Amino acid sequence: RMDEHYPTKLPNGAQPYKVILNEVAIRNDGSLFKDHAVHAVLKKHFKDVKHEGGEWFACTLADVQAAILEVKTGVRNEDKRTLSFGLRPEQTAAIDKAVQYFDSYKSENTDKTPHFLWNAKMRFGKTFAAYQLAKKMGWKKVLILTFKPAVQNAWEEDLANHLDFAGWQFMSRKTDFDVADLDKSKPLVCFGSFQDFLGKNKAGGIKANNEWVHATNWDCVIFDEYHYGAWRESAKELFEAEDKNELEFAEGEGMAYFDEANMPITTGHYLYLSGTPFRAISSGEFIEEQIFNWTYSDEQRAKEVWQDEVNPYAALPRMVMLTYQLPPAIRDVALKGEFNEFDLNEFFKADGVDVNATFKYENEVQKWLDLIRGAMLE
C-alpha cells in the first residue's frame, strides 16, 4: 500500500518511507477489519487528531495504536490507551488463590483482616495482576504503600495505559490533585511511600496532607517490595534509596520501623508483594495457604511446555543463578562481629567511564575473584 503512495525509491535504492507500526488487522472476535475502520475512530473519537484529507492524519504513533485497539476490542478508547494484553496462567492462578483465601478467611473471621503474599520473581507482572485482583474483588479504594518509591512508574503506567482500567483514578505525592476533586463513583488507586503516609510530624501527629488517607477505610492495602520492610530496621537505613530525590520522597519523620499490627490505617484486605520475602516466610509470618509462589524455574518450565501458537514466555530469557559457599575461615571472621557489614554497591563502585573506568576497591575486588576461583583452597 505504501509503495502506491511512494513508487519512486531514493538514489541509494532505499524506500522513501519508514514503517513504524505493523499490526494484524483481526478483531478480538476473529473478524477482519480494514484501515477505514481506524480512520473512522481517529476522526470521530480523537478530537485532537487532525484529518488532513483522504487517508492522511496529523497524529502520533500512540494515537494510531489507541485507535487500532478500539477497533479490535470494540470498546471506546477516548483515553487513548494502548495496551490490551491479558493475564498469563500463573497470574490468573495467583489471583484465584488470593480471592479464595480472602473469601474463606472473611467467612470464618468476620472481625479480622486477611493477609496474603505473592512471592513472585521479577517479570511476573505483580502490578498488572494486583490491579486485576482489585477488579475481580470489586475494590474501589486501593492504597499502595511501597518500601521503594522508584516503582511508582510501573503502577501508574499500567493503570493509565491498559484498556481494562479505563476510568480508574491514580494519585500520588507526585501527581497534582485535590482530594475534593475525586470522583467517588470511580475506582481510586493511591500510591505513596510507607514513611510518608505512616510517618509522624514533629509534634507526633499525622501529617496534615495525609489525614484523608488515615480517615479512609481502604478496600485493600498493598505492600509493594515488602522485603524491604520485613527487616524491621530504621526507616532511613531501610530505604537505601538509589538517589537523593527518591530518599526525599520516601522519608517520613518519626517512623522508627514498620509494624503492621499498629498501623493507623484501616482496610479490609492486605496484599504483600515481594520477590525475596525470605525473612517474612522463615519467621512464620505467612503460612502455606497465605502464599502464592512463582519462581524463575516455574517460568522457564511454563515456557518449555507451552503448546499454543503464541508463547507469552518466549521473550523471557533463561536465567542461571549461582551461589557460592563462603569458606569456614571467612564465616568465622564475620560471626565474631568484627567485620559484619557489607555494601555490595560500595564494594563494586567504579570511577570513570568506558575504557577509563576502574574499581574504587580494585585490590579487594581482585581478592574476591581469587577467592571464588579457589584461592582459599590452596
Task: Label every model-predicted segment.
Residues 106-133:
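Walker A/P-loop
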Residues 110-111, 183-186, 203-219:
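Short basic/glycine-enriched coil/helix segment immediately N-terminal to the Walker B
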Residues 127-163, 196:
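Conserved Walker A/P-loop ATP-binding site and its immediately adjacent core
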Residues 163-204:
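Inter-Walker segment of RecA-like/P-loop motor cores
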Residues 195-196, 211-271, 276:
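SF2 helicase catalytic motif II
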Residues 269, 280-377:
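Interdomain helical connector at the RecA1-RecA2 junction of SF1/SF2 helicase-like NTPases
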